[in-house]
Design a protein with these regions (language model features):
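N-terminal, charge-rich alpha-helical recognition modules
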Residues: 1-136
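Alpha-solenoid helical repeat architecture
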Residues: 71, 145-146
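Buried hydrophobic core positions in alpha-solenoid tandem helical repeats
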Residues: 80, 140-143
Length: 146
């Protein structure tokens, strides 16, 4: 479960005001599936530094994190988009859009700067992303061995 303290620690300075109980609740109830919810919460915290690289809204960031989380679970672009934006997807279907048209929307979303930035950061190994914590852990292990 994410707390406001976790959010305050993880979010860049310009987003500290958004670290509210409301946001924590939203992240804690992001999915009915506990595995998906945990993945999205972890990714939201892990990739928060992406928010410093552009002019993004927190809602856009959360949606991009959800999309990338579904992609990392092995889902296709289309299924990831459908799970991230269920209402938007149903609207496209109810408007009679063809699979080809929907695929164009999905492809456009998957190539946005925000999604691309999160995907790029997700390719960086965790130990490299958190080098300082990794080094402290190694130093602690060395001390314990002595």
């Amino acid at each position: 479960m994410i707390t406001t303290e976790n959010l305050l620690t993880a979010l860049p300075v310009k987003f500290k005001a958004a670290a509210t109980q409301s946001l924590a609740d939203k992240l804690n109830t992001v999915s009915k599936d506990p595995i998906v919810a945990e993945s999205v919460r972890n990714n939201f915290i892990t990739y928060a530094s992406v928010l410093q690289t552009g002019r993004y809204k927190l809602e856009e960031y959360l949606n991009a994190v959800k999309y990338v989380s579904f992609k990392h679970m092995g889902l296709t672009n289309q299924k990831s988009y459908q799970n991230t934006f269920p209402k938007r997807y149903l609207k496209l279907v109810s408007e009679g859009r063809t699979d080809k048209e929907i695929s164009a929307y999905v492809a456009a979303y998957s190539k946005t700067k925000l999604v691309t930035a999160i995907m790029e950061q997700s390719l960086i190994p965790m130990w490299l992303l958190h080098t300082d914590a990794y080094n402290k852990a190694v130093e602690t292990q060395v001390e314990l061995m002595m």
